[in-house]
Amino acid sequence: MASAGKPALDDSRRGTGSPKIKGRENAKDTLCRNITIYGRCRYEDKGCAFNHDPHKVNSSNQSDSKKRFNVDSPSFTPSLLSSNGSSPTSTPATTKKMTTISPKAANAAPFQPRSVVSRSNASTPGLRQDTVTPDWTVAEVQEFVPQGFDNSHLAALQGNGNGPITSTSPFDPFVTTPTPLSAGGAVGPVQPNPYSHDAAAALGGAAFFPGAAGFQQPVQYHLYAPIGPHNQNTLGYQRNVHDLFLPNDFREELQKKAAATLQTLPNTQLPAQIDYFHSLVPLDLNHQKNATIFGFPSWVYKAQSSKDGNYYALRRLEGFRLTNEKAIRSVQAWKRVCNGSVVTVHDAFTSRSFQDSSLIFVTDYHPLSKTLAEQHLGAGQQRFQGRHNVQHIPEQILWGYMTQIANALKAIHSNGLAARVIDASKILLTGKNRIRLNACAIMDVVQFDSQRTVADLQRQDLVNFGQLIVTLGANSPTVMHNPTKAMEHFTRAYSPQLKNSVFWLLNGMQKDQDRNIDVFITGISSQLMSTFDSALHLDDQLTSDLSRELENGRLVRLMAKLNFVNERPEYEHDRQWSENGERYFLKIFRDYVFHQVDAQGDPVVDLGHVITCLNKLDAGTEEKITLISRDEQSCFIVSYKELKKALESSFQALMKPARRMH
């Protein structure tokens, strides 16, 4: 068997011998190198054997490739199939037969790949189906076109160590193709979003990594962000100096409150210290004793605490003697009342610092606050006004007072307490139409032995509430001496809704129906929404005013750092602190910012120029400026980026321990 197979092997080896080295018989199909290098060949007409037509070479290559790879060639069909993986027995006859192709192969179907097999075919691999149509063809598959990916970012994305790059999201706002995989249109690289602080979002979602992996761009602190509301009639490019600071009226109000808080009274006859309070300043405008409300003369002082350094209001009841220790403990329940319409009570104690037995209540201090009696029922206003010149309080302001008092009573009654003192002389006006109930806990101590129930006292609060509104509406503290006439006057001045609400409060002691503060709040819910909307507008205004001062603190710190470095006399002869280098730039930069003069030599006081230069210095922009020395003999062109670097290095050198010990 072995000897019979040798002649076939020898024939096959002789048929596939190594090719001989040929000469230049195929030079006519090779493009001349002179054409490739110089574009022409000087020996083309002098016997150059190579081809000088590039188009002819390309066409010949294409025809050659067609000869080598032709999809129309018949598919390969083996002559003998092995069964169960066993190799057939080789014979000389069969060997010669296997080296040839049957003539029937010319009529065979063209070869088509079957890389995808249906589930039905995969479940029965042993069955052979001769007439099976392919499940899919190459033409049905759409060409893959990547979206939102730029090759320039490939190295940066692979360097994050987050594994392979995931596919981009089909919902890309920067890609205008209608489908996520479009074979017809080509998609260019995605333009980065310049307003995004996320590296992945800047690429339009191409790099879908977590935001923490990307570099977070710093906030542009040198830009002032004008937060609304905006009610000015200026153009978009116009800015006022007042846009960068608080409004003048608001600033003056805050400064006056700060001055009133820090006010002291020298050479006073008041005690130097009461318990842990000192620096007493009287707050009463009327020096006459009045015991109408509490049954004892009361005085109000401002004092500073030795414990926390804050300022508090001390209300003193003159001549009060405590007979029951449980009475003063009732103040502990008022400490739990935390409401914006109630003055917070902090402590209560007795003292003999005024050479008598006094009861002291410690509450929050609101500087420059007035009472409603001083604001609307002042004696000076009523003395010189005739009957027809009385200015009624606007109804919207009265509704604002009612909603705030209702809010205070809601908090007090929810804690099982009663205000018991709802009087115009004991309600503080701490801001524009902003009121707070005051002196609420005093009656619980003074009248501790009272037999009235809490429910009865809460209904009495409703009656006192209604009487207060009628008194304010009539602008007269004695109007309730004649209730019928007072209500007739109130009805003529205000709307039926306000009148009905006041009538309901005045009938609070009647037990014909359930009368409490919750029922009253339900009845005035529409006005509560109006007051709430006004509070939201005020919050927006305060936020806008606060945003103006947001960047000014940063500029102050920058100016302080600049002045720390410039012209230090103790380092004048220190070579390491010479002003010939980068510190000299900072010195003449200060002259550029603050010491400019006009053409006539007059000083230029331009706040906008100062703020602009400091903001550019803090941002470290690439903008270049011209700095001229004081003797006008030297001129330097530097950028804000270089100035910022010089300022930081100089300040760090100043902060070194060796420098501070020098």
Swiss-Prot record:
Residues 263-525 are annotated as: Pseudokinase domain. Pfam families: Pan3_PK (PF18101). GO terms for biological process: mRNA processing; nuclear-transcribed mRNA poly(A) tail shortening. GO terms for molecular function: ATP binding; poly(A) binding; protein kinase activity; zinc ion binding. It comes from the Eukaryota. Residues 565-662 are annotated as: Knob domain. Regulatory subunit of the poly(A)-nuclease (PAN) deadenylation complex, one of two cytoplasmic mRNA deadenylases involved in mRNA turnover. PAN specifically shortens poly(A) tails of RNA and the activity is stimulated by poly(A)-binding protein pab1. PAN deadenylation is followed by rapid degradation of the shortened mRNA tails by the CCR4-NOT complex. Deadenylated mRNAs are then degraded by two alternative mechanisms, namely exosome-mediated 3'-5' exonucleolytic degradation, or deadenylation-dependent mRNA decaping and subsequent 5'-3' exonucleolytic degradation by xrn1. This is PAN2-PAN3 deadenylation complex subunit PAN3.
